Amino acid sequence: MGKAKKVVLAYSGGVDTSVCIPYLKKEYGVEHVIAFAADLGQGDELDQIKQKAISAGASESLIGNLVKPFIEDFAFPAIRSNALYQGRYPLSTALARPLIAKNLVEIARELNADGVAHGCTGKGNDQVRFDVTIGALAPDLQLLTPAREWGMSREETIAYGEKYGIVPPVSKKTPYSIDLNLLGRSIEAGPLEDPFEMPSEEVFGITSSIADSPNEPEIVDILFENGYPVAINGEAMEPVSLIKKANSLAGKHGFGRLDIIEDRVVGIKSREIYETPGLLLLIKAHQEIESLTLPADLLDTKFRLERQWADLVYKGFWFSPLKEALDGFINYSQKQVNGTVRVRLFKGNVDVIGRKSKENSLYISDMSTYGSEDKFNHKSAEGFIYVWGLPSRIWSWINK
């Protein structure tokens, strides 16, 4: 296989992906670098990216609006899966990577490129997600990974870029590395590399501090149909608008901040700061409506598989047979997950204060009550307990 001459680069506008453009041309002999930036709802951040790529030497600069598929095809399945990596991180950044990689491959096919490239470094998770996804979708395409191979320090990378007129967005005054999409923000590097250092308020952008959040609680109703959130406070919304509304409501009350130590795929621990107000709110509400509408054995099994689903996505296996099989289980489990969850937002907390399902609630008040309306047959308990505990009694008879 000869050297790739036409390459589509996953472009973010940051230092590494900007430096990749001249580096691919000079060091790899690539003749045409096509920069592709994904619009995932990050807003104004994309305004200057197109021209920035051209200034860095790209032959063409493309921006793809992926907000709708990002929310509908990636975020909403994660909500139905209650996806929390290591029980805490809702995959706000990880969910975007297979979508970007998929579009990278599609553009390469459309433009007859013979390679694709990314600017991920050798220490992060994203290199794994891009490489595994591209390998699964297009094993014939050449994959170029200059930032993993060039061996330059951060300072050397910046200096290399400056020779080509690339101005770094990070300075000593703003030393943080930030990734942003509609699901939230991830912040790392700088002072945050000390896991005992409290993050300053300046690192947060979409959640209020507790001090600045409202002094009165807010009650919010979230309606689910087949496990999908479809309305907030009685107002039906399409998925993108619903995520925006959930972000606004939860973020205003200071909910959705995470400060965690996370185990990366490559084997190292990292300190990560996340803001994911809407996604965490919706997952919490979804867990609650499931508790009302699903039987115990299905809940227990789904709980175990949810962690596996989150692990697969975090580790780059969105397009894998096991992930697809788990999707089938989760899709079936959501057929009766219908109803409304009521939450109270206040000072960084979300408390579930009510839940109801007109058609699918498994909570039967006549069976659960301790009042005079009680229809539970108490006499049946004795025989049930005898049979239920029989293995323990047999064990005791034989061994004690």
UniProtKB/Swiss-Prot annotation:
Q: For L-aspartate, which residues are the binding ones?
A: 121, 125-126
Q: What is this protein called?
A: Argininosuccinate synthase
Q: Where on this chain does ATP bind?
A: 10-18, 38, 119
What family classification does the UniProt entry report for this protein? Belongs to the argininosuccinate synthase family. Type 1 subfamily.
The reply on keyword Amino-acid biosynthesis is: yes
- PROSITE patterns, per the entry: ARGININOSUCCIN_SYN_1, ARGININOSUCCIN_SYN_2
Q: Which GO terms describe its molecular function?
A: argininosuccinate synthase activity; ATP binding
Q: Which Pfam families match?
A: Arginosuc_syn_C, Arginosuc_synth
Where in the cell is the protein located? Answer: Cytoplasm
Q: Which UniProt keywords apply?
A: Amino-acid biosynthesis, Arginine biosynthesis, ATP-binding, Cytoplasm, Ligase, Nucleotide-binding
Catalysis: reaction(s): L-citrulline + L-aspartate + ATP = 2-(N(omega)-L-arginino)succinate + AMP + diphosphate + H(+)
Q: Which domain of life is it from?
A: Bacteria
Uppermost EC category:
ligase
Gene Ontology BP terms = argininosuccinate metabolic process; L-arginine biosynthetic process; urea cycle
| One cellular component (GO) term of this entry | cytoplasm
Pathway(s): Amino-acid biosynthesis; L-arginine biosynthesis; L-arginine from L-ornithine and carbamoyl phosphate: step 2/3
Sites binding L-citrulline sit at 89, 125, 129, 177, 186, 262, 274
